[in-house]
């Protein structure tokens, strides 16, 4: 269901975002806080509240991004229709889509693609940029994904009696989930799953360390 509204890179990116935030909280408390005075319920509420808040923020930013993209597309179509020559129009499309640098096709195929794109855009109907139902569902999915990543960290904090052990379990679970996201990511890009999982874990740990060091 998620991938009906979000691309795999978007959904996996949101999971990483949420896990990094949750790990920043639990690892930061373990490294910098006093575990003797730790109040599990307060920490769990703070952890979940942080992820829910940032999930909402990220969802709203997604909606703004969708509006911006549609507005930008409409502006490009209007600009394209004002161009006096076909050569200028093709140049504008080349600049907008930027496929030349990817070396995905031969020049003659790219030229045919740009001509077809020009024909489509010249006859495209311009609609007012607005938020659609699919955008709202995608934003909701983002809120759910980012919020859900707080659960693996919050559950041990609430259920394990020893705060030090609870934090170790929470951190271990979150690191395992980071690896799982990287492992799953590799399936979409044809990379080595184990290597990708380990790279994602290492990269995210570095980001968490930077966040903690800077007071985040």
For the regions a language model picked out, list residue spans one by one:
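Cytosol/matrix-facing amphipathic helices and coiled-coil assembly/linker segments
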Residues: 71-142
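Interfacial loop-to-transmembrane junctions
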Residues: 180-205
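Hydrophobic alpha-helical membrane-embedded segments
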Residues: 48-78, 82
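Transmembrane alpha-helical segments and their cytosolic interface motifs
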Residues: 10-19, 126-175
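Juxtamembrane boundary at the C-terminal end of a transmembrane helix
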Residues: 208-216
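Transmembrane helix-loop junctions in multipass membrane proteins, especially transporters and channels
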Residues: 33-36, 62, 66-74, 158, ...
């Amino acid at each position: 269901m998620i991938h009906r509204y979000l691309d795999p890179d978007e959904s996996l990116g949101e999971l990483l975002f949420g896990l990094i935030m949750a790990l920043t909280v639990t690892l930061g408390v373990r490294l910098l806080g006093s575990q003797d005075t730790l109040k599990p319920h307060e920490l769990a509420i703070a952890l979940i509240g942080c992820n829910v808040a940032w999930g909402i923020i990220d969802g709203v930013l997604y909606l703004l991004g969708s509006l911006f993209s549609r507005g930008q597309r409409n502006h490009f179509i209007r600009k394209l229709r004002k161009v006096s020559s076909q050569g200028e129009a093709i140049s504008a499309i080349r600049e907008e889509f930027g496929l030349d640098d990817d070396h995905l096709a031969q020049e003659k195929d790219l030229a045919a693609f740009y001509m077809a794109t020009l024909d489509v855009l010249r006859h495209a109907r311009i609609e007012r940029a607005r938020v659609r139902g699919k955008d709202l569902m995608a934003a909701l999915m983002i809120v759910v994904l980012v919020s859900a990543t707080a659960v693996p960290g919050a559950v041990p904090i609430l259920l394990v009696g020893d705060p030090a052990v609870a934090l170790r379990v929470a951190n271990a679970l979150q690191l395992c989930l980071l690896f799982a996201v990287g492992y799953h990511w590799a399936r979409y890009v044809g990379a080595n799953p184990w290597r990708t999982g380990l790279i994602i874990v290492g990269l995210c740990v570095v980001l968490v360390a930077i966040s903690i060091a800077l007071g985040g």
